[in-house]
Amino acid sequence: MLYLSVPELIAEAANFVPAIKDAGVETTFERLSSIQDQVLVVKYGGNAMTDEALQQQFAQDVALLTAMGVPVVVVHGGGPQIDAMLKRVGIEGQFVQGMRVTDADTMGIVDGVLCGNVQGQIVNLINQAGKSYGVRAVGMSGKDGRMVRVKRMHLPDVQNPEIEHDIGLVGEVIGVDTALIENLLDGDFLPVISPIAADDQGVTHNVNADVAAGEIACAMHANKLMLLTNIKGVLDKQGELIANIDSASATALKADGTLYGGMLPKIDSALDAAQRGVGAVHIVDGRVPHVLLQCLLTDADVGTAIRV
């Protein structure tokens, strides 16, 4: 079966993003050339997972990028879906510094929701969006192929690091074996990874999706890591977007309470990845239509760039 050429794929992308059409094929091809054959890790979560139009747009974006020669690895969350299932069975979800407190009952639900319904839906959407491009998505978790190894996390308090919070079966990543991911990419498959992993005793743990994405990006020596969120990016106290952030400014924003909740593991993962050599790290607004194509193939400033 014959698939579309790169110029034809760029024309497809231009149907979704007017700025690509405005820039023209030659300029867009130059931008694309700078990211082809270099791994892109995307953390997919938040509203982009629950809004049907945004779901379709995300699938179209990763399918097009893959067809254009960008090796894409998707690591997904599923907080809204987990919360809905916990509510259905009468369990109240709890969080400490953006990390889900995970007892044994909660772990079973998290595992089932992420590795079942959520992952299956993402894989199906990408396969449908990419079938005319020859793109094939495959779902797995961090347990498959012993890809992600963890130990039980004891979370230091953000204000007083001498205090540690026991948050249950939440995994701290101690190793990533990239062999399975690399084999899939070499076979022209698009890996979709649920952030579930096991410790050395085989006990299943929940891993924060931002953390998992960052660790996988580092292990893969990724060119780019993009963390999708429900807001414009990292915001200051006035709710204005911070275009660039580094470790020193992030530490100050944590200390004064500007950064809190789910943004804490996100910013920590982003800074860690940038410091460990991931080429470019961005926290971007997953509510923006076709945000991946906009960030990668146009000069649009969407979200917050992480600086070392």
For each predicted feature, which ranges?
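Nucleotide/pyrophosphate-binding catalytic subdomain
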Residues: M1-R287, Q294-A300, R307-V308
